[in-house]
């Protein structure tokens, strides 16, 4: 490791010396050990880095990118390396010009002499460029032990000394006295350039802040108090302020003047700072005009209408949203509503917005519903008391008086609001390709569908089908009560007609159905079925009438009168004494007519009916009728089969027992 450090130190000796001088002059102290560690990492991951070093800021930015890539791959890069890299990159930024910086080796050998001559002949900008190109040549070309320190001081610090001479208040306390371009005395030679000497640094003096100035056109110039009307704003500095100068109020000096600040101005300034200036352009803006001569107090100020077209970014967002989500998706409705209410849109703007965002078939639907809405609005304007002087040509942006943009820009606020409402309503009626609008009667809640989703579908269908808002609200409330699944319907049934005045019925229904279908709800339903207690804590009651006592709220089998006073009621109603042991089952005191036992006290089954008739003999029937065999020649002489069976039945019947007469004789 020691050999590697010594190798790095000898390889980049000149460049290391220059970097240390540059950083020390900027008020930053970096140890040689940390710089050697930095160049070890650079040599490991950036083999393209030149041995003679470079002053090109692009090369150091490239080093940072490659070190980040190495860190992502798992290589360990010390924190000091990142700190030193950032410090060196920041120190090289003032030396960059519009042209690419050259490598150190490309500078001519006589640059030290030519540099001083050129700086006296050229302007300040050209001087800085030449200084950036040739500043490192004396350090790189020779060893630090052979450098003329007086000449090196003049080469490295000419512009810094000039700036210090112009702005002495920006220099630290130790160097508050302006200095010219004279050479350094022998005692003030930088420590890093003194050969084989060790000088103890004075740590009591604070380091000089490293400051630099951008070109004049890039500097921020705060607005004057008289221009923007901010009483607490400090006056602008007389000289060149250090970069960057943080703004106090407004972020855009080129914005139009305003007499008082507002939140809208701050938002617009922030968007302009971020680069999104087109998003805040209003199609039509009304700017107050200065009062003319003879204007009386109390008169409304005269305004001037100015039109600006939509930004390409806004139209692109609308087109992508319609293509990806659909014209009536929640995202598109919110975006369209914000554009409509945040801008003063004229009919021409609505047409451009629809043409650029919708497909041809969707635009045809939008135009159709637009015309239909205009006709309805014109009828309302004529029926109003007093009539509203807004015709169909104005709402559509057609005709001789309203066909141009300049004419539409002068529309009244009431006409703008009517156009907005009509176009938003027409946009909502646009149907996606291949989809049909179902009837609100057919919208029903699924068995596992959440109640809010069902209501959202119902509202969407009703909004496309019913034009009148009051009728749409009544239909939605009715269908939200009639068409949910049985679980939600049982939850909202107690709220029918009991919602307080001023409360939203749909919101109350949604609250009542909150959590329906979940695991907790199913567990509560099971507990309800077991205990008879509903979710609200009330006992479930039967709505019918008891057939025993005539009261409402229970069945006959659960009648408390029947269960408690059954015997007394039977005795008083029948007029008989209480029954004794049942003669049928022998195991209960009740009447035999009321016995419902299927087994007696011994476990023997009991028949359902006590008295039965005698069992009848089974009648055996054959599959085919019996036909006796008769020869072919005796068919006419054979008697019918019925006569044969009748004769057989008249014969005496004998069995194993002798007749009674024979038994007596024996």
Curated annotation (Swiss-Prot):
- One GO molecular-function entry: zinc ion binding
Give the UniProt keywords, A-Z: Cell membrane, ERV, Lipoprotein, Membrane, Metal-binding, Myristate, Repeat, Transposable element, Zinc, Zinc-finger
| Residue stretches of biased makeup (Pro residues) | 232-247
Q: Which InterPro entries match?
A: B_retro_matrix, B_retro_matrix_sf, Gag_p24_C, Primate_lentivir_Gag_pol-like, Retrov_capsid_C, Retrov_capsid_N, Retrovr_matrix, Znf_CCHC
Could you give one GO CC term from the UniProt record?
A: plasma membrane
Q: Which domain of life is it from?
A: Eukaryota
Modifications made to the protein after synthesis: Myristoylation is essential for retroviral assembly. Alteration of the glycine residue leads to a block in the budding of particles and an accumulation of Gag inside the cell.
The record's section on PANTHER family has: ENDOGENOUS RETROVIRUS GROUP K MEMBER 24 GAG POLYPROTEIN-RELATED
The miscellaneous annotation reads:
Insertional polymorphism. Provirus present in 29% of tested individuals.
Q: What is this protein called?
A: Endogenous retrovirus group K member 113 Gag polyprotein
Gene name linked to the record: HERVK_113
């Amino acid at each position: 490791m020691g050999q590697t450090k010594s190798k790095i130190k000898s390889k980049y000796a000149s460049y290391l010396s220059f970097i240390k001088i540059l950083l020390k002059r900027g008020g930053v102290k970096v140890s040689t050990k940390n710089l050697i560690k930095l160049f070890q990492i650079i040599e490991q991951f950036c083999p393209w880095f030149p041995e003679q070093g470079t002053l090109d800021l692009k090369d150091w930015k490239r080093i940072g990118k490659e070190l980040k890539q190495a860190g992502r791959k798992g290589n360990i890069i010390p924190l000091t390396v990142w700190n030193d890299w950032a410090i060196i990159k920041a120190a090289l930024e003032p030396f960059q010009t519009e042209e690419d910086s050259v490598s150190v080796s490309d500078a001519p050998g006589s640059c030290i002499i030519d540099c001083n001559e050129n700086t006296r002949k050229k302007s300040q900008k050209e001087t800085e460029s030449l200084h950036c190109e040739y500043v490192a040549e004396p350090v790189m070309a020779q060893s630090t032990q052979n450098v003329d320190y007086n000449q090196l001081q003049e080469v490295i610090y000419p512009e810094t000394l000039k700036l210090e001479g112009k702005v002495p208040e920006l220099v630290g306390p130790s160097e508050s006295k302006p200095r010219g371009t004279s050479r350094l005395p022998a005692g003030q030679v930088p420590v890093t350039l003194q050969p084989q000497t060790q000088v103890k640094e004075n740590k009591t003096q604070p380091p000089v802040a490293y400051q630099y100035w951008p070109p004049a056109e890039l500097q921020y110039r705060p607005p004057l108090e008289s221009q923007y009307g901010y009483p607490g704003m400090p006056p602008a500095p007389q000289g060149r302020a250090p970069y960057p100068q943080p703004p106090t109020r407004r972020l855009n000096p080129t914005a139009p003047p305003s007499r008082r600040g507002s939140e809208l101005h701050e938002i617009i300034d922030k968007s302009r700072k971020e680069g999104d200036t087109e998003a805040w352009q209003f199609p039509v803006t009304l700017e107050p005009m200065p009062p003319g001569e003879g204007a009386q107090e109390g008169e409304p100020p005269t305004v001037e209408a100015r039109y600006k077209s939509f930004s390409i970014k806004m139209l692109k967002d609308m087109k992508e949203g319609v293509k990806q989500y659909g014209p009536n998706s929640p995202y598109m409705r919110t975006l369209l509503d914000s554009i409509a209410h945040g801008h003063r849109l004229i009919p021409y703007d609505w047409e451009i917005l629809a043409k650029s965002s919708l497909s041809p078939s969707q635009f045809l639907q939008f135009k159709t519903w637009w015309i239909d809405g205009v006709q309805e609005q014109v009828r309302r304007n004529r029926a109003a008391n007093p009539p509203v002087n807004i015709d169909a040509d104005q709402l559509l942006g057609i005709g001789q008086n309203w066909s141009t943009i300049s004419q539409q820009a002068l529309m009244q606020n009431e006409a703008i609001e009517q156009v907005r409402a009509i176009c938003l309503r027409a946009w909502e009626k646009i149907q996606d390709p291949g989809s049909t609008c179902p009837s609100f009667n057919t919208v029903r809640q699924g068995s596992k569908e959440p109640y809010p989703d069902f209501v959202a579908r119902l509202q969407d269908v009703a909004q496309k089908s019913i034009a009148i808002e009051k009728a749409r609200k009544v239909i939605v409330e009715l269908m939200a009560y009639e068409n949910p699944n049985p679980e939600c319907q049982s939850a909202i049934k107690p709220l029918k007609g009991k919602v307080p005045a001023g409360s939203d019925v749909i919101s109350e229904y949604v609250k009542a159905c909150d959590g329906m279908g979940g695991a907790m709800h199913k567990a509560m339903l099971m507990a309800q079925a077991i205990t008879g207690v509903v979710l609200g804590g009330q006992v479930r009651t039967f709505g019918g009438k008891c057939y025993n006592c005539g009261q409402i709220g229970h069945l006959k089998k659960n009648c408390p009168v029947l269960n408690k006073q059954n015997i007394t009621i039977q005795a008083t109603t029948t007029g008989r004494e209480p029954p004794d042991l049942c003669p049928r089952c022998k195991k209960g005191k009740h009447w035999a007519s009321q016995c419902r036992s299927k087994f007696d006290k011994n476990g023997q089954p009991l028949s359902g009916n006590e008295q039965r008739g005698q069992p009848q003999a089974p009648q055996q029937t054959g599959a085919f009728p019996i036909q006796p065999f008769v020869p072919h020649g005796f068919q006419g002489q054979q008697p019918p089969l019925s006569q044969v069976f009748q004769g057989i039945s008249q014969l005496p019947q004998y069995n194993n027992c002798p007749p009674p007469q024979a038994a007596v004789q024996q």
